[in-house]
Amino acid sequence: PAQYMFKDVPDVANIADPVGYTIEQMDKYGIERAFLALNTFSDMNAEARDRFPDRFVFDLPIDPNYGMDEIARIRGLMKEYDVRALSFFPSGSYPQVAINAKEMYVFYAFCVDNDLPILVNAGVPGPRYPMAPQMVELIDEVCWFFPDLKFVMRHGTEPWEALAAKLMLKWPNLYYSTSAFAPKHYPSAIIHFANTSRAD
């Protein structure tokens, strides 16, 4: 868990209607639509989809260790949910799978064929797992091999955020998500990139 990194983490365990509470918070802060990680071990995703179909879209976390069986699972869930992206946590997979590992190539190809972006944690992970699978330099090879892949770096890319910005200049389909950061903590290299390059 990465809770050690955050202050005043809200306790939502005792909320009777988590989906309704989420909608209330979205309305409070002017959020029209939310991107949810599709968790097949919970009924909450189906509830969110059915109660508020216009308010939620889904990214589907994948485990590349399951190979083609995982591809079959993805296809099945895409028929049930409005899946807009796949997502991958390299350091959190078990066994760990690096960003540029051969196990990932079938998923990158799937994303290209289905016009889906892939959201990939990059940089030192918040949870206390080894960081090697998420080193930003590994993204360079993937972008070279899959020039049509929409690859989104998420959760900071630190301490290689300057390299992340440089790679975005190099590869037109490489993007950066500000996930896991409050705006006051955005890395300066990313702010500079946003203000000077591809800002649209």
Report the location of each language-model feature.
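An N-terminally biased module of ancient metal coordination in phosphate/nucleic-acid-related enzymes
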Residues: 1-36
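Well-ordered, non-membrane alpha-helical segments in soluble/globular domains
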Residues: 16-21, 43, 135-137
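Short, acidic/polar
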Residues: 14-25, 66-78, 161
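Generic hydrophobic alpha-helical segments
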Residues: 22, 45, 73-74, 139, ...
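Active-site gating/metal-coordination segments in enzymes
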Residues: 32-33, 39-126, 130-133, 170, ...
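A structural motif corresponding to the C-terminal end of an alpha-helix
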Residues: 24-32, 52, 113-114, 145-149
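Catalytic pocket-lining loop regions of alpha/beta-barrel enzymes
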Residues: 84-85, 98-200
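N-terminal cationic-hydrophobic initiation segments that often serve targeting/anchoring roles
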Residues: 26, 49-53, 78, 143, ...
